[in-house]
Amino acid sequence: MIRLASTSETRAKLLQDTGIEFIQSPVDFDEEELLKVYKNPRDFVCAAARGKMEAAVEKYGLEIPIVAADTVVAVSDEILRKAKDEEEARKILQKQSGNKVDIITCMIYKDKEKTVEDLDVTSYIFAPFDEEDLQNYLKSGQWRGKAGACMVEGFCKKYIKEVLGRESTAMGLQVERLAEIAKDL
């Protein structure tokens, strides 16, 4: 049994599909302040995951091992955050259209004996997005709450030309690596 320090439905589904028993426990951590300090996406995502882990340990303790994670989307090392509105979502998606997009996830596992930090990157090469299709996606609102306004399992799927890496990383949790770490639980 592990404690997933996240409200993400996608991360919870990944754990369910992998057969890892868990309880989902949200934590309050504002990662926006970190953007002022960390410009490199890899440094930022690890700092955010560490912040979430610290908040989870403080709130819940380590009676149950904890997993915390953060994911960012980046194009040419520019961090693409969650869009605040439709216009920002359009700009973010236009940067991804026809480009290589890195989805970077830092996952941290912590129990009473050990802490394991795992950084993984999945890269997608996208074909240019169709303007009408993009407009329909924006109107649907499905981009809300998504890092980089990106849904590789939804809107972006048909534009994928090439994938380098694991789908689970792109979805926010390296469950294959977590299963190795937590196999004794």
Curated annotation (Swiss-Prot):
Stated name of the protein: Nucleoside triphosphate pyrophosphatase
Pfam families: Maf
GO biological process: nucleotide metabolic process
Annotated TM spans: none
Homology family: Belongs to the Maf family.
Organism: Nitratiruptor sp. (strain SB155-2)
Classification lineage: Bacteria, Pseudomonadati, Campylobacterota, Epsilonproteobacteria, Nautiliales
NCBIfam families associated with the record: maf, PRK04056.1
Cofactor: a divalent metal cation
InterPro entries from the UniProt entry: ITPase-like_fam, Maf-like
